[in-house]
């Protein structure tokens, strides 16, 4: 504050003819910038057209490049009397503010240099110029999976695009958290750079993942094991079909023999009836004796058959109850090696599950 008051007094005391103080002279070694900032009027500048820079970096770039149009010219105020010092100071302050607010004049050399550095990408058919000349903003071409697929030519993804163009079937090996899951054979429709695929008309051969304790004991699945298991299942199915056909034929034969036995029983009943009719002509005394003998024989037979039937039914009941208890104790056996096949109209396979892709033979 003392320096400020001292600078103000010295400026008021000085006459227009007297030389400026060395502390307010810009070209002097004893120049005091703080005192010049708090002075009531601007100190005289030896070069009135000197450019004004915003910071030191801008000044360094000016020294390196030699550009002269970046700065703003600042004029020097004429010395005024002590009475008109306040008016001149306010006028100089307003003019400096207006100059600071004004935009800097563009440098034509710099603009030409930037234009030379710009690279214009023109299309082969010359449509870029027509787009720029046309009114309004030009529409960008759509960018999606279908437009990016042809850009992978000359790479493994380019071979996938060739399979799409030519309609070649592909085999896609997919995996689970442990190893191989199965093989999908179908026609490729779309893909992306992450190997996500969409297929149609797919035949899948797969095995369900092994869980529980069998996961630790089970060996990793391979293609040979997968298809060998499938062949084994097909052969076992054929054997089961042949066995079922043989059983059907034996059942049909058994049904025919049972019908023949029933017919023979019916024939015996008819013969018994005819013999009964003939026995009516026999005397009553002979008929009574024959009836008593037949009754005694029938009673003996029934007692034997009842005992045997009771024992047989009891033994059968015990065996059935034991068999049922055993069946309840037994757990259903799960075949973890079973291979399944199915047909899918369309399927999406994530790229993280793809192991291998090759052409179907």
From Swiss-Prot:
What are the disulfide bonds? none
User: What gene is behind this protein?
Assistant: Lsm11
The keyword Phosphoprotein belongs to this UniProt entry's keyword annotation:
yes
Composition bias of kind Polar residues appears in 307-323
Biased composition range(s): Low complexity: 76-96
Please give the CDD domains that the UniProt record associates with this protein.
LSm11_M
Domain text: The C-terminal SM 1 domain is both necessary for the binding to the Sm-binding site of U7 snRNA and U7 snRNP assembly. The N-terminal domain is essential for histone pre-mRNA cleavage. Amino acids 63-82 are sufficient to interact with ZNF473.
* Region annotated Disordered, chain positions: 1-26, 67-142, 268-335
Q: Where is this cross-link: Glycyl lysine isopeptide (Lys-Gly) (interchain with G-Cter in SUMO2)?
A: 121
Family classification: Belongs to the snRNP Sm proteins family.
| Matching SMART domains | Sm
Q: Reply yes or no: does the keyword Ubl conjugation apply.
A: yes
Give the principal location in a single coarse category. Answer: nucleus
In terms of InterPro entries, this protein maps to:
Lsm11 (IPR039267), Lsm11_M (IPR034109), LSM_dom_sf (IPR010920), Sm (IPR047575), Sm_dom_euk/arc (IPR001163)
Q: How is it modified after translation?
A: Not methylated.
Q: Which Gene Ontology biological process is one annotated for this entry?
A: regulation of chromatin organization
Q: Which residues form the Sm domain?
A: 155-230
Where Omega-N-methylarginine occurs, the residues are 41
| Name by which UniProt lists this protein | U7 snRNA-associated Sm-like protein LSm11
Which residues are annotated as modified residue Phosphoserine in the UniProt record?
15, 21, 155, 281
**For the region SM 2, what residue ranges are annotated?**
344-357
What segment(s) does the record annotate as region SM 1?
172-205
Q: What does this protein do?
A: Component of the U7 snRNP complex that is involved in the histone 3'-end pre-mRNA processing. Increases U7 snRNA levels but not histone 3'-end pre-mRNA processing activity, when overexpressed. Required for cell cycle progression from G1 to S phases. Binds specifically to the Sm-binding site of U7 snRNA.
The cellular component terms of Gene Ontology attached to this UniProt record, alphabetical and capped at eight, are: histone pre-mRNA 3'end processing complex; nuclear body; nucleus; telomerase holoenzyme complex; U7 snRNP
Highest taxon above the source species: Eukaryota
């Amino acid at each position: 504050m003392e320096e400020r008051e001292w600078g103000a007094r010295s400026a008021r005391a000085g006459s227009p003819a007297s030389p400026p103080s060395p502390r307010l002279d810009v070209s002097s070694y004893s120049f005091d910038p703080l005192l010049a900032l708090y002075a009531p009027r601007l100190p005289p500048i030896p070069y009135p057209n000197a450019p004004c820079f915003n910071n030191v970096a801008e000044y360094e770039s000016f020294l390196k490049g030699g550009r002269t149009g970046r700065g703003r010219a600042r004029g020097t105020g004429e010395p005024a009397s002590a009475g008109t010092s306040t008016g001149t100071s306010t006028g100089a302050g307003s003019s400096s503010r207006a100059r600071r607010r004004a935009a800097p004049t563009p440098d034509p050399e710099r603009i030409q240099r930037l234009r030379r550095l710009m690279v214009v990408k023109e299309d082969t058919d010359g449509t870029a110029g027509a787009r720029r000349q046309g009114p309004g903003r030009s529409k960008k071409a759509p960018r999606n999976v279908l437009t990016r697929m042809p850009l992978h030519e000359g790479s493994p993804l380019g071979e996938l695009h060739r399979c799409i163009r030519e309609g070649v079937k592909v085999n896609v090996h997919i995996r689970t958290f442990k190893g191989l899951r199965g093989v999908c054979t179908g026609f490729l429709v779309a893909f992306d750079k992450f190997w996500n695929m969409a297929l149609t008309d797919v035949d899948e051969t797969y095995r369900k993942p092994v869980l529980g304790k069998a996961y630790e004991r089970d060996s990793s699945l391979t293609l040979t094991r997968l298809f060998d298991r499938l062949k084994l299942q097909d052969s076992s199915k054929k054997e089961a079909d042949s066995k079922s056909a043989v059983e059907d034929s034996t059942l049909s034969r058994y049904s025919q023999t049972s019908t023949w036995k029933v017919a023979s029983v019916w024939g015996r009943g008819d013969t018994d009836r005819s013999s009964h009719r003939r026995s009516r002509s026999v005397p009553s005394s002979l008929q009574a004796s024959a009836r008593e003998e037949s009754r005694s024989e029938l009673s003996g037979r029934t007692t034997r058959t009842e005992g045997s039937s009771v024992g047989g039914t009891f033994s059968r009941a015990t065996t059935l109850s034991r068999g049922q208890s055993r069946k309840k104790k037994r757990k259903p056996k799960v075949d973890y090696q079973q291979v399944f096949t199915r047909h899918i109209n369309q399927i999406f396979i994530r790229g993280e599950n793809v192991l291998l892709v090759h052409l179907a033979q």
